[in-house]
Amino acid sequence: VKVTHRNVANLLLTEPGGLGIRPGDRVAHLLNVAFDMAAWEILGCLTHGGTLVIRGRDLTAAARTADVLIATPTVLSGIDPAACPRVRTVAVAGEPCPRPLADRWAARAAFHNCCGPTETTIVNTMSRHDPAAALLTIGRPTPNNTVYVLDADRRPLPIGAVGEMWAGGACVSAGYLDDPALNAERYAPDPFLGGEHRMFRTRDLGRWTADGQLEHLGRTDD
């Protein structure tokens, strides 16, 4: 996937994607470098003057001294929040987050439930979760990005209706390297933004809630 500097900068240099990282903050490096979310850890930390805490075999040892954690729910589930008193911000993505895990961490830190495939530059929606909320959503599009919930004919669906989520805006990557057939299948001109903008077919199912949040409801190819 051809991800551009512009794509990455749009996530890291705007909030909430910047995760409030400040000079001197410690960000735990928990993820495999082959995973796109590792770029969020590494580049997000260094861009804002933070200190990257390189892990050994013990993830908790790195998390214990960190202010910010970025992880998949599976990785995060192996870390006890009580063992990480410094942590003030947590972001998860890469797979659906169990509600109990979100509630447990949100009681101690700013907890962001996020969503987005590699083709939309790590994540393109984020939600700061409140344990008292009725739903655990994937939130709203991050700055300069859009999400369209469309029917099979690529027409927008009303609030509450389930459809396929297409991503638009600054997050949309430049396509697959040397794969025109797959590019034609997954990328399309964005009729809503117009011009040279393109949108990406995520194959994720979702719907808008009445208060403008996105609910993730699985995959079209499950």
What do the PLM-derived regions correspond to, one by one?
Residues 47-50, 70, 80-137, 146:
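Gly/Ser/Thr-rich phosphate-binding loop
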Residues 22-23, 27-29, 39, 83-86, ...:
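His-Asp-centered acyl/peptidyl-transfer active-site segments
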Residues 25-26, 50, 67, 95, ...:
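Surface-exposed loop/turn positions
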Residues 58-59, 75-76, 97, 172:
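Alpha-helix capping/helix-boundary segments
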Residues 8, 110-113, 128-222:
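AMP-dependent adenylate-forming
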Residues 1-26, 35-67:
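Conserved AMP-binding/adenylation subdomain of ANL enzymes
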Residues 21, 31-35, 118, 169:
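Conserved AMP-binding
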